[in-house]
Amino acid sequence: MANKKKDHREEAVELLKQDAKRILQLIKVQMDNLTLPQCPAYEEVLDTQMYGLSREINFATRLGLIEPEEGKNLISALEKELSTLHELSMSKK
């Protein structure tokens, strides 16, 4: 049973990482092709996506699939990547 829980845990972490990567990719496309970071539509998409990911992480934490600290680290890493992307975008314009 412990091995099965470990498999679910690893799968949950991998799915959350994939979702974080998808958010980053979505924001990259939006910044490259559609809108500026100051645009309300950009901010709305980013806020919605980040909120959704935080709810997924909360759900996985409540199920015991990930540790709270691991979820915080995932959000923090994504926020850092998005901040770097934002800075690069602003320096190009």
Curated annotation (Swiss-Prot):
Family according to the record: Belongs to the UPF0358 family.
Identification of the protein by name: UPF0358 protein lwe1048
Signal peptide coordinates: none
Organism expressing this protein natively: Listeria welshimeri serovar 6b (strain ATCC 35897 / DSM 20650 / CCUG 15529 / CIP 8149 / NCTC 11857 / SLCC 5334 / V8)
NCBIfam families: PRK13666.1
Superkingdom of the organism of origin: Bacteria
Pfam families per the UniProt record, alphabetical: DUF1507
